[in-house]
């Protein structure tokens, strides 16, 4: 049996890091990556050169890592070109973007619903970054939806006017400063994996198999399981350090089958809290997400027990579920941030 093989996934309830409580998230983007970032940063070796995030979305993991100053830089990418265009504006000129958003926020007040529809039409024709920022701030529960032609088609949230201009400015400027020196680009995840060096770490968060077999309106494109497995085989063979969120469960609904055991990946089951998608549908369902750790990264971190030990609660370690002797050090900034947070995470859309 290989070092990273286990018959059953390791079950863990991730602890939140106090040091991530004030990460400046620029984009209101539905999903669980903000919670998972508390896990990912614990698994980044102290010698990490670059964090690669090829399914960027809200770039929550890149923001968390750079907020804690882990690694030299972050390179995040996506095949969603308008989204990357927005991120490039945030990196290059957050003040001008904030000014434009502020003007739009004021202009909408005469007829918010009609203004939203007008901006949505313009965005689908022009793909301007400021249009996308406004739509993300104003759409229902920050839940992005696309039609079969790839056009943004989510409706307006009639309960609110979106993030206030002063607060949006603060988020954009702080996110830009946090990501200083980072790069955003349009790229296929397979190319990103091919660029990785031995001291890089890639975090992959592709559409799950359960939402990729058919056209899912949350993504501009799906991802066939066979393609992703082939990419993982190549990444393992090349010795790439990576983490991948793939299959999972929300309530009774299962998203996809586990990745093949013969890949030799360490399989963790993480309690990700209440599903934001279920909440949007008026339901309450606990979410369990799978996180896979590549053999190369497990070796860099000192072995399976040491990986689990970075994530397990003290009581789990005391019961002998994990080892502790000889554990490679965490990045200093992660150690400083490791006190637990009692208050629950809140979704971006619920913040003032």
Locate predicted features:
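SAM-dependent nucleic-acid methyltransferase catalytic core
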Residues: 2-42, 46, 93-203, 207-215, ...
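Generic structural hydrophobic/aromatic packing signal, biased to beta-strands
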Residues: 87, 133, 152, 175, ...
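SAM cofactor-binding core of SAM-dependent methyltransferases
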Residues: 47-120
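Short aromatic-enriched loop/helix-cap "lid" or pocket-rim segments at secondary-structure transitions
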Residues: 86-89, 144-148, 255-257
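Class I S-adenosyl-L-methionine
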Residues: 1-75, 79, 182, 187-196, ...
């Amino acid at each position: 049996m290989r070092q990273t093989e286990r018959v059953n996934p390791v079950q863990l309830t991730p602890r939140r890091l106090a040091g991530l409580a004030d990460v400046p998230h620029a984009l209101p983007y539905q999903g669980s990556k903000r919670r998972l970032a508390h896990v990912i940063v614990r698994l980044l070796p102290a010698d990490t050169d670059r964090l690669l995030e090829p399914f960027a979305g809200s770039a929550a993991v890149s923001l968390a890592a750079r907020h804690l100053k882990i690694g030299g830089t972050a390179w995040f990418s996506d095949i969603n070109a308008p989204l990357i265009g927005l991120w490039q504006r945030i990196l290059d000129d957050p003040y001008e973007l904030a000014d434009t958003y502020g003007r739009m926020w004021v202009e909408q007040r005469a007829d918010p619903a009609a203004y939203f529809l007008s901006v949505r039409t313009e965005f689908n024709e022009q793909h301007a970054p400021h249009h996308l920022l406004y739509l993300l701030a104003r759409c229902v529960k920050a839940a992005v939806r696309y039609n079969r032609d790839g056009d943004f088609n989510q409706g307006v949230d009639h309960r609110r006017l979106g993030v206030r201009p002063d607060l949006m400015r603060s988020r954009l400027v702080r996110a830009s400063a946090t990501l200083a020196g980072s790069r955003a680009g349009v790229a296929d995840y397979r190319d990103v994996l091919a660029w990785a060096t031995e001291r890089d770490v890639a975090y992959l968060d592709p559409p799950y198999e359960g939402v990729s077999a058919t056209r899912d309106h949350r993504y501009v494109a799906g991802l066939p399981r066979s393609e992703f497995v082939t990419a993982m085989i190549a990444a393992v063979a090349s010795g790439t350090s990576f983490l991948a969120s793939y299959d999972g469960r929300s309530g009774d609904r299962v998203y996809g089958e586990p990745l093949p055991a013969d890949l030799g990946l360490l399989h963790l089951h993480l309690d990700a809290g209440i599903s934001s998608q279920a909440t949007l549908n008026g339901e309450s369902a606990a979410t369990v997400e799978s996180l896979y750790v590549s053999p190369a990264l497990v070796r860099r971190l000192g072995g399976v027990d040491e990986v689990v030990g970075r994530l397990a609660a003290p009581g789990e370690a005391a019961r002998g579920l994990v080892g502790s002797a000889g554990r490679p050090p965490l990045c200093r900034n992660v150690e400083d941030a490791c006190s637990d947070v009692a208050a629950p995470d809140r979704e971006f859309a619920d913040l003032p």
